[in-house]
A protein has these predicted regions:
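Flexible "arm" and connector segments at domain edges
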Residues: 1-129
């Protein structure tokens, strides 16, 4: 039995994204990849950056509700962008997850991002395809 708070990536997240974009008449690209339409690409990029700025403001204010809203919007926009660009999100997710799980926890602040909260690539790490 599935816990009611756990949702399915395909049915819930990707299904919701599909319904949303279809409702407003946004069309998925026929070809896979970043479209030639620079206006669309620039809009989606700016949209993500706007939400990241909102998240930063929420964290600064210690506003949990606004932080959660911004994080969900970031995921929504990122998934929507992948959907519009016809990118193979589920396959990509699995590949990135596999690569991420082969990383190791940083042991000191002297690592790449200067914090022991980070995870780093071991010497034999392989990037996702």
């Amino acid at each position: 039995m599935t816990h009611p708070d756990i949702f399915n990536l395909h049915e819930d997240l990707l299904g919701d994204i599909n319904k949303f974009h279809n409702k407003f008449g946004f069309k998925k690209s026929q070809k896979v990849g970043i479209p030639e339409d620079s206006e669309l690409v620039n809009f989606r990029t700016s949209f993500l950056m706007e939400e990241l700025a909102e998240y930063t403001q929420a964290i600064t204010k210690k506003d949990d509700a606004a932080a959660l809203d911004a994080l969900i919007d970031i995921v929504y926009i990122a998934l929507g962008t992948a959907w519009l660009f016809n990118l193979p999100f589920e396959k990509g997710w699995r590949e990135v997850q596999k690569a991420n799980m082969s990383k190791v926890r940083a042991k000191s602040k002297s690592k790449k991002r200067g914090t022991a909260f980070d995870v780093i690539k071991p010497k034999d790490w392989k990037a996702p395809n």
